[in-house]
Amino acid sequence: MLLTPGEEPTALPDPVVPARASSRATPKATASALRRVLRRARDGVALNIDEAAVAMTARGDDLADLCASAARVRDAGLQSAGRRGPGGGLPITYSRKVFIPVTHLCRDNCHYCTFVTVPGKLRARGAGLYLEPDEILDIARRGGELGCKEALFTLGDRPEDRWPEAREWLEARGYDSTLSYVRAMAIRVLEETGLLPHLNPGVMSWSEMARLKPVAPSMGMMLETTSRRLFETKGLAHYGSPDKDPAVRLRTLTDAGRLSIPFTTGLLVGIGETPAERADTLHAIRKSHKEFGHVQEVIVQNFRAKEHTAMAAVPDAGIEDYLATVAVARLVLGPGMRIQAPPNLVSRDECRALIAAGVDDWGGVSPLTPDHVNPERPWPALDELAAVTAESGYELVQRLTAQPKYVQAGAAWIDPRVSGHVRALADPVTGLARDVNPVGLPWQEPDDVGSSGRVDLNAAIDTQGRNSETCSDIDSAFGDWESIRAHVHELAAQGARAPERLDSDVLAALRSAERDPAGCTDSEYLSLATADGPALEAVAALADSLRRDTVGDDVTFVVNRNINFTNICYTGCRFCAFAQRKGDADAYSLSTEEVADRAWEAHVAGATEVCMQGGIDPELPVTGYADLVRAVKARVPSMHVHAFSPMEIANGVTKSGLSIREWLISLREAGLDTIPGTAAEILDDEVRWVLTKGKLPTSLWIEIVTTAHEVGLRSSSTMMYGHVDNPRHWVGHLNVLRDIQDRTGGFTEFVPLPFVHQSSPLYLAGAARPGPTHRDNRAVHALARIMLHGRISQIQTSWVKLGVQRTQVMLNGGANDLGGTLMEETISRMAGSEHGSAKTVAELTAIAEGIGRPARQRTTDYTPLAA
């Protein structure tokens, strides 16, 4: 067994990628099938999985034909990208690196690996369990003196989960995990040597990668194979290695894309996989990269058997098999992908053959450190590698650890905290490496965000409107729209498979809800959610009756002010028209002084609450959120600060290094009173990952909100609907909220948020509905009242999104609260809402009186106002 008794693998709670087929049959590679595939390759047609598997069987003249097609694709890609070496030739790139083996311990047991060992063997040879900081820095410094610019951090997966000695080593030095140690050492390498960390710690969760992104321009993890057969079958390469589950590795690859991390991945050739499984692996990488654009290079690595391993007797990958796989990788992944092959695992002549097969990158090559994964295979000397490359008609050109297009894209891909280190080493024109040695630079949080951009947007949005229809990079910021639309079609097909609801179903569900509103089955709730006509009237009447019994006839509201302190954001929420990139015509950031000024203005106008939310600006300093709270409390001590969505909290936690609980307590101590339960959208990841590229997963939203409640920070709860969702998702979302409320009791209200579509990128791309119908609005508000009965008493309706008349309809169908006066509102208005951004107390009172109900001002948490 890999784990010590009583231990379990570290949980990775983020969304799980559906498992692929356990194995894939290799199509019969007849001569005619191969001829057809080779013809398609010559024509530049992308090969599907079966065609790719057939192509991998090419040998002799057929292999030469295949490689020639791949080389043409590679050259066309380099030419179209304008990539040239200093001498004007097409480049083949490499990264001059040092290899830093942080630890040789691992919780896995891959049958071909000599990198990993056990604590006893390390002790026997006098080696530490981990490299000490001084050892890491010594390697980096010596590499810098030789012109190295990359520090490759390689290590085993989560050794502390298997080895108590590893956990003791970390705890003795103040680290709670290996990844925390890696992060700290990456910062020291940046500050003390200037080398750029490339982090290769294996499988990571969304949260872990978000934590590491600020300390490394790039990361990597070999996918290796999508073959479940190799993972599940005793005696095969990945059996007994929990981190080699293909679904888990695909999840890491996907989450890296969601976080916009330049990411290196690849496959191993010759570990027992079939050509069809190899082709499936390439297509899995292709699919992920197509959706997110984050795979910066794909390593095609040939298996080399090593002594003293379980696979010592397995033959090395054959060179023709290897070349065919490289060529197919180029043809499948296309002209824009960097295809990499390690030059130390082949001979000089084979290096030339790899170039002929479509390779355009040699990966990291070190003049100082060995390849600790393949220690028996020394790196070629750089002048020798340059000569081999030149013999094939190409120039050897040094790059940085992040490929040039990601370096040149800036903040969309490179975190501001390492961007200065990258700029110091990058050619500003090409994004390749400059001919300089690295020098240590401070790794620090950005300075306090000052006032910039269109700071009057809160007022001008109602008079002048937007200066631009969308953010500047709508074509690239949200991933591949074709892939997104495919996901939407899958969701629509699932909705279409829902059983037809008959009037008798709704009637039976109504009778059940009348007896026990909170005790119906999901099927009954779904019947209520899909009701229409007279049946919908009956559902709304039941909801209105429950509202009256629960909270009475008063229509409540809070006098508050929205303060959206910045709209600069790179998260990539596809539904959001508020987010802008720095420098966009409508982008802005408020200083803490301006936020405090607006809080004072709100106080003078009678407000008891400010609601502060903003975009996820990577330049917001680590103290930024607390600074905003303190500024408001210093100016208006009595003001209730309702601020920061779970996404903002996740961002703050990532920046700070604190746990969620510690960060929330620190904000509470700074003066934070409650948090908005926004950033929920739909709490179902199959919908969530269509709506957003990089927002926190459902599991983390739940953890943050639950923890907030536990430390005394109550929250609202929300659901945004009417985009790519269906009633089944509404029921599921409300069930999640019910479960949290049962455990914490921390929700103050529920707020249904109709999707405002007009300027939403998701809608403009043809992937979303034009918002909910009036039937949907009525059904959601009524369903919420019924399902949340006895748990959440306050159901709010949004006059900003619905307008006065439809707001009144919702108040007669289960809702009892109008939200707030707002004073300013830019998120819905930038999306295209036409119902204004502020209401006076008199106007909100008129909404209630228009349906014969009294209006009453409340506090944020619905306690009575002080006299």
Curated annotation (Swiss-Prot):
SUPFAM superfamilies in the cross-refs: Radical SAM enzymes
This protein's record includes keyword S-adenosyl-L-methionine: yes
GO MF annotation list: 4 iron, 4 sulfur cluster binding; 5-amino-6-(D-ribitylamino)uracil--L-tyrosine 4-hydroxyphenyl transferase activity; 7,8-didemethyl-8-hydroxy-5-deazariboflavin synthase activity; metal ion binding
Binding site residues for [4Fe-4S] cluster 2: C569, C573, C576
EC number in record: 4.3.1.32, 2.5.1.147
UniProt-annotated stretches for the region Disordered: 1-28
Substrates-to-products reaction catalysed: 5-amino-6-(D-ribitylamino)uracil + L-tyrosine + S-adenosyl-L-methionine = 5-amino-5-(4-hydroxybenzyl)-6-(D-ribitylimino)-5,6-dihydrouracil + 2-iminoacetate + 5'-deoxyadenosine + L-methionine + H(+); 5-amino-5-(4-hydroxybenzyl)-6-(D-ribitylimino)-5,6-dihydrouracil + S-adenosyl-L-methionine = 7,8-didemethyl-8-hydroxy-5-deazariboflavin + 5'-deoxyadenosine + L-methionine + NH4(+) + H(+)
Region (CofG-like): 93-425
Keywords: 4Fe-4S, Iron, Iron-sulfur, Lyase, Metal-binding, S-adenosyl-L-methionine, Transferase
Pathway: Cofactor biosynthesis; coenzyme F0 biosynthesis
InterPro entries the UniProt entry points to: Aldolase_TIM, CofG_family, CofH/MnqC-like_C, CofH_family, Elp3/MiaA/NifB-like_rSAM, F420, FO_synthase_su2, rSAM
Domain Radical SAM core: 92-344, 555-796
Region (CofH-like): 532-865
Signal peptide bounds: none
Cofactors named for this entry: [4Fe-4S] cluster
Gene3D superfamilies: Aldolase class I
NCBIfam families noted in UniProt: CofH family radical SAM protein, F420_cofG, F420_cofH, PRK06245.1, PRK07360.1, PRK09234.1
Function comment: Catalyzes the radical-mediated synthesis of 7,8-didemethyl-8-hydroxy-5-deazariboflavin (FO) from 5-amino-6-(D-ribitylamino)uracil and L-tyrosine.
Protein family membership: In the N-terminal section; belongs to the radical SAM superfamily. CofG family.
Entry protein name: FO synthase
Organism, scientific name: Mycolicibacterium paratuberculosis (strain ATCC BAA-968 / K-10) (Mycobacterium paratuberculosis)
